[in-house]
């Protein structure tokens, strides 16, 4: 088998594995929809409740006692 033939076989194998391993948009949208819905509910709780989680955050102490005004 010559070098050109081996290179052609290599390219065909790479192309075949790329086509097989790439998911279609239709199949991946159903799985990602549940993750995106769950993320929306998690983000505000992380942003609004900073007291007690990390002492290095830039949260003013009055937010912990709800006395900011």
UniProtKB/Swiss-Prot annotation:
Disulfide bonds: none annotated. Expressed by the venom duct. Negative results: does not show activity on Kv1 channels from several sources expressed in Xenopus oocytes (Drosophila Shaker B c6-46, Xenopus XKv1.1 and XKv1.3, and Loligo SqKv1.1). Belongs to the conotoxin A superfamily. This is Conotoxin SIVA. It comes from Conus striatus (Striated cone). Pfam families: Toxin_8. The cysteine framework is IV (CC-C-C-C-C). The modification 4-hydroxyproline is found at residues 55, 60-61. Neurotoxin with probable activity on sodium channel. Induces intense repetitive firing of the frog neuromuscular junction, leading to a tetanic contracture in muscle fiber (spastic paralysis). In vivo, shows the same effect as the whole venom when injected on fish. Intraperitoneal injection into fish induces a period of rapid swimming followed by a spastic paralysis with stiff fibrillating fins. At high doses, the peptide is lethal to both fish and mice. The keyword Glycoprotein applies.
